[in-house]
């Protein structure tokens, strides 16, 4: 049986995060907190989109908060590994993921993480402005952005000033050669969506959540590919 609530599939290489994402049925915003993908009551639940964010992952640019359980050693594709994103060494080669949707693949670029009280996980609680996503992402990066990305940005900026201006100009963007190669170099852009992945964690408070932030943009089709 196909579940009409399915809206995407998240996959983060190098982690156990590999699971379907759903939208909760109307009137039951936390249904998948205690029900699996088949609709059966289960402590495992299923990763689901915050009802305040709508019922699609493809209405971009936008803000999308996705919740998933942390099941520890038996995580089975859920969100437990997001708790590890506070560790610089662990996350260093796990900064990208893919969110597959009916509209196409969304490239995820993780750029920040923080631990908050469980009561502070909504859009307004996190100080996210739907009218200024670019500014919101910049504020998040300043508050809890990954240090290695900030260092990379500083190095790229320095390279620009010591001899890479020509390559930068050829791209028509700021940020140096690394920005040229990808078009996204740790900086928020107007076309990006903000994704927030939320899971339980157990470090500071008795009821806390780890939030991992990612910029997301639709993957461009290869040259010559049909749309």
Question: Where in the sequence are the language-model features?
Answer:
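Solvent-exposed, non-transmembrane regions of membrane-associated and secreted proteins
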Residues: 1-227
């Amino acid at each position: 049986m196909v579940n009409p609530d399915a809206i995407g599939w998240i996959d983060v290489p190098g982690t156990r995060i590999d699971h379907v994402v759903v939208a909760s049925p109307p009137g039951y915003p936390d249904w998948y907190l205690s029900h699996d993908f088949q609709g059966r009551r289960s402590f495992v639940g299923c990763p689901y989109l915050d009802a305040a964010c709508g019922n699609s992952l493809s209405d971009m640019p936008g803000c999308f908060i996705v919740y998933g359980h942390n099941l520890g050693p038996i995580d089975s594709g859920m969100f437990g590994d997001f708790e590890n994103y506070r560790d610089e060494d662990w996350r260093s080669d796990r900064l990208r993921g893919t969110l597959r949707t009916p509209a196409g693949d969304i490239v995820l670029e993780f750029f920040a993480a923080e631990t908050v009280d469980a009561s502070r996980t909504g859009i307004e609680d996190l100080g996210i402005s739907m009218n200024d996503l670019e500014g919101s992402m910049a504020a998040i990066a300043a508050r809890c952005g990954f240090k290695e990305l900030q260092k990379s940005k500083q190095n790229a900026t320095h390279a620009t000033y010591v001899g890479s201006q020509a390559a930068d100009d050829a791209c028509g963007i700021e940020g140096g050669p690394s920005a040229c190669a990808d078009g996204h170099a740790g900086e928020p852009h107007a076309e990006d969506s903000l994704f927030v992945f939320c899971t339980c964690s157990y470090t500071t408070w008795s009821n806390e959540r780890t939030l991992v932030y990612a910029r997301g943009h639709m993957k461009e089709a290869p040259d010559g590919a049909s749309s």
